[in-house]
Structure formats: C-alpha cells, structure tokens
C-alpha cells in the first residue's frame, strides 16, 4: 500500500484531444489529363483521450505531477484523393473506482467500476474534407478544403472512491486499523491518537470455509464530518462503495466518551452525507477493545441505551488484541456481503453490456447559437462554441474558403446581429483567432 503522503484520491487534470487532419486542395495532373479535376483527400481523425480502469492501481498518484494530456493530431489529406491516417488514441490508466466529473459544472461524466472498463473523455476532431467534396457544376475546380476539426478540450476532476465490500467506520482510535491488521495482510499505521489513518487501507479477508471479501479501514469520523469537519467528506466518499459497514464503538472506560452518543453521532453523519444516505447500508455493530478492564460494564450500559432507543441489533464483542470474537464477526460480515450481492444481482434488470467503452457526449446546441459583444468603438467579438469550430475548420488560405465562410455567417444571421449592435463598414470583428472587417 502507498504511504499516507502518497495516497491521492482527488485531482484536477486537463485533456486535449487531437485535432483532425486538414483536407487537401489538389488536382489530378496525369498524362493527357492536365485539368483532371479535384483530387484532394480528407484528413484523418484526431486521437481521442480514453480512461481505462486498472485494478492494479490504488491511487491517482500518476496524475499528481503530470496534469495536462494531449493526444496526437490526425494526418493531413493527400493527393490522389488519399485519406490522411487517423491518429492513435491516448489511453490513460486510472484505478478501479474512479469517478470523472466536469471540473467547472460538477456534472458526472462517468464512473469506472470494472477492471478494463473504458471511458472516452475527450473525442478527437474529425478530419477536414478535401476539395473532392466541393466540386459543383458551376465550380469544377474548387480551391477549397476544410481544416481538421479541433479536438475536445476538457478540464476534469477525478475522484477515487475505494472499492471495498466491508468498510470499518467509527471514531478515531476505536481499533479499526488493529482489526484490519489482524484479519488481513494489510499493514496500516497504528497509534493511539486521532487521525492515524489519513488514507484508506485495503486488505483481503480469507475465511477457512473458502469465502473472501475486501475490507477497508477508513479514516476516523468526528462530529460534523458530513459538513467537512476533520477528514469529513474525504472519508464519507469512500463509504459510498462499501456493501457492509462494521460500525465500531470503543468500550474503553478510560476514554471519557459515552458509547451510545458515539454510535448515534456516527450514524447521524452517515445519514447527513449529501451524496447518499449512507446509514441505509447493512450494518454490524461492533463493541471493540473488550480486553480493557471495565469494558464489560460499559458494554452493558451501551446495550441498554441501544434498546431504549429502539435499536434491535446484536452487538458483536471484539478484542483485536486477544482475537476474541474475530472469527465470528468475520463470518457474519461474509454472510451480509453475500446477501447484498444477491440483492444487487436480483435488482439488475438489464444484462451486462459486452462493450465496456463509453463515450461521453458533451452538450452541443442543435443550432449554431452565438452572441455578439461590443468590445469598444468599432470592435466586436462573436462568441459561440460551434461557430468558433466552424471558423477553425475553414481554410483561410484560399479565397474560396473565405467566401464560403462569409456565406455561412450571413445565413446564420451574424451580419444582421452585427448591424443591430451598431456595426458599420470597416469595423473589426473577432471570432476566436480569426478577424475580419465588417462590410454591409
């Protein structure tokens, strides 16, 4: 397992898919055919950026020092109507359990929960069309081709939620890490002070009857965790993935705490988590540290308080030091994991998709929406995502391309809107990196 200083469960990155290759302006010049017509091929598709879930990874550490990723552009079109070669996609491995969000809107883009699952987070631009596509009866030798479409650019937030069948929850220093070290091969840091566990520790529990399940020792909770106090939201995020909660309450009579109040506080924080009501998960109540003198009396009072508040659950007594109750507790946890898995399988009405690759489709308006901003006297800027892409795909090195763009802008109503904003002949108009003089 990584050390506390290297565990990374949340990060921000930028992804830039590859630009499509430019279409080509070319003509056939074969023997006996000096004016053989257009023969410029299309550009190749730009590389997409694809996340791949890999269960060999445990953290988002790979994204800690490298935050910008760029795929290759497609190859330009060629002569003799030959297409340019498509660029290779850029695959980035992430841990299983990674959720991807748009950094600015907070919208969830995808959730990678299976090994090998893929998610296209930035799609490569399509190749521009060569001049073979623009021949008409009027213009049989078009000097026009499209530039490749820009690849998608996104700023993303990656969030790792540990995938564990069983999660150990409770106040700091109730024995969660000790239990994990006893029942698995995990080696968590253990000490008698708050927040020793600053990251989830994960291990596998193997029972004598052949059953197994994964268990996570999660950072300790305190009052107000659902609002971010202490390790707060960082902790609760990881509880989301668990099937069963082992709710550990210390029976140490010397810690000055009331066992039922601790139990109720943790339950309240689980229920208050804004993403999901975590208190609805299957729970086993565990009375920990039963080897400490005076623990029996505190346990008796805890059971009375539970009954008085209508909590009708068995309390499992545990000492990780003497191993009292460990086997029985692990067997019960395995039973509940199996029950939850059976319920999930029954609830799954749709068959599992064979294709594991998902492409996230970002919203694009059906119409080319745009706005006109007056920057200063005689200066205007036009904004609009699709309009800017149209300009970027226009080959401005050829007069035919410029005239075609002008016609499309006029049909879209750009000229009318500029006039309505007070534009006159000779005013400067900007669209992305492109500028032109307005002519009425």
Swiss-Prot record:
Keywords: Cytoplasm, GTP-binding, Hydrolase, Magnesium, Metal-binding, Nucleotide-binding
EC main group: hydrolase
Residue ranges occupied by any Obg domain in the UniProt entry: 5-163
CC annotations in GO: cytoplasm
Entry-linked InterPro entries: G_OBG, GTP-bd, GTP-bd_Obg/CgtA, GTP-bd_prot_GTP1/OBG_C_sf, GTP1-OBG_CS, GTP1_OBG_dom, GTP1_OBG_dom_sf, OBG_GTPase
Annotated EC: 3.6.5.-
Locations listed in the record: Cytoplasm
Molecular function per GO: GTP binding; GTPase activity; magnesium ion binding
The OBG-type G domain, residue ranges: 164-338
Binding residues for GTP: 170-177, 195-199, 217-220, 288-291, 319-321
Positions contributing to Mg(2+) binding: 177, 197
Predominant location: cytoplasm
Start and end residues of each OCT domain: 362-440
GO BP terms in the entry: ribosome biogenesis
Cofactor(s) of this protein: Mg(2+)
Pfam families associated with the record: DUF1967 (PF09269), GTP1_OBG (PF01018), MMR_HSR1 (PF01926)
NCBIfam families: Obg_CgtA (TIGR02729), Obg_CgtA_exten (TIGR03595), PRK12296.1 (NF008954), PRK12297.1 (NF008955), PRK12299.1 (NF008956)
Assembly and binders: Monomer.
Functional note: An essential GTPase which binds GTP, GDP and possibly (p)ppGpp with moderate affinity, with high nucleotide exchange rates and a fairly low GTP hydrolysis rate. Plays a role in control of the cell cycle, stress response, ribosome biogenesis and in those bacteria that undergo differentiation, in morphogenesis control.
Assigned protein family: Belongs to the TRAFAC class OBG-HflX-like GTPase superfamily. OBG GTPase family.
Entry protein name: GTPase Obg
Species of provenance: Lactobacillus delbrueckii subsp. bulgaricus (strain ATCC 11842 / DSM 20081 / BCRC 10696 / JCM 1002 / NBRC 13953 / NCIMB 11778 / NCTC 12712 / WDCM 00102 / Lb 14)
The gene coding this protein: obg
């Amino acid at each position: 397992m990584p050390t506390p200083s290297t565990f990374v469960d949340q990060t921000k990155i930028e992804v830039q898919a590859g630009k499509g290759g430019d279409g080509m302006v070319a003509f056939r010049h074969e023997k006996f055919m000096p004016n053989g017509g257009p023969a410029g091929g299309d550009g190749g598709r730009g590389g997409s950026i694809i996340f791949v879930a890999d269960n060999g990874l445990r953290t988002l550490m790979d994204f800690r020092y490298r935050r910008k990723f760029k795929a290759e552009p497609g190859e330009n079109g060629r002569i003799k109507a030959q297409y340019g070669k498509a660029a290779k996609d850029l695959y980035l491995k992430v841990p299983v359990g990674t959720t991807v969000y748009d950094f600015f809107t907070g919208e969830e883009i995808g959730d990678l929960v299976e090994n090998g699952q893929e998610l296209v987070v930035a799609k490569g631009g399509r190749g521009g069309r060569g001049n073979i596509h623009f021949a008409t009866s009027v213009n049989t030798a078009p000097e026009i081709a499209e530039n490749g479409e820009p690849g998608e650019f996104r700023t993303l937030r990656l969030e790792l939620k540990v995938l564990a069948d069983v999660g150990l929850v409770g106040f700091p220093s109730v024995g969660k890490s000790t239990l994990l070290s006893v029942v698995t091969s995990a080696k968590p840091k253990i000490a008698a002070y708050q927040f020793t566990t600053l990251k989830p520790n994960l291990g596998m529990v193997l029972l004598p009857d052949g059953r197994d399940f994964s268990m996570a020792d999660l950072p300790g909770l305190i009052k107000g965790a659902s609002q971010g106090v202490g390790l707060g939201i960082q902790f609760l995020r990881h509880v989301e993935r668990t099937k069963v909660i082992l709710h550990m309450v210390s029976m140490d009579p010397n810690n000055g705490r009331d066992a039922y109040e601790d139990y109720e506080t943790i339950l309240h924080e689980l229920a208050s988590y804004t993403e999901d009501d975590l208190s609805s998960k299957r729970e086993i109540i565990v009375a920990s540290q039963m080897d400490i003198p005076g623990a029996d009396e505190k346990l008796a009072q805890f059971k009375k308080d539970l009954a008085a508040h209508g909590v009708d659950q068995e309390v499992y007594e545990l000492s990780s030091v003497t191993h009292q109750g460990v086997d029985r507790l692990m067997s019960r946890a395995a039973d509940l994991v199996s029950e939850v898995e059976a319920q999930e399988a029954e609830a799954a009405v749709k068959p599992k998709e064979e294709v594991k690759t998902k492409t996230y489709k970002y919203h694009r308006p059906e119409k080319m929406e745009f706005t006109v901003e007056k920057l200063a006297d005689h200066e205007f800027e036009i904004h609009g995502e699709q309009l800017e892409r149209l300009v970027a795909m226009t080959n401005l090195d050829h007069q035919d391309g410029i005239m075609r763009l002008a016609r499309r802008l006029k049909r879209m109503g750009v000229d009318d809107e500029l006039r309505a904003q007070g534009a006159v002949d000779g005013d400067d108009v900007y669209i992305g990196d492109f500028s032109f003089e307005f002519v009425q």
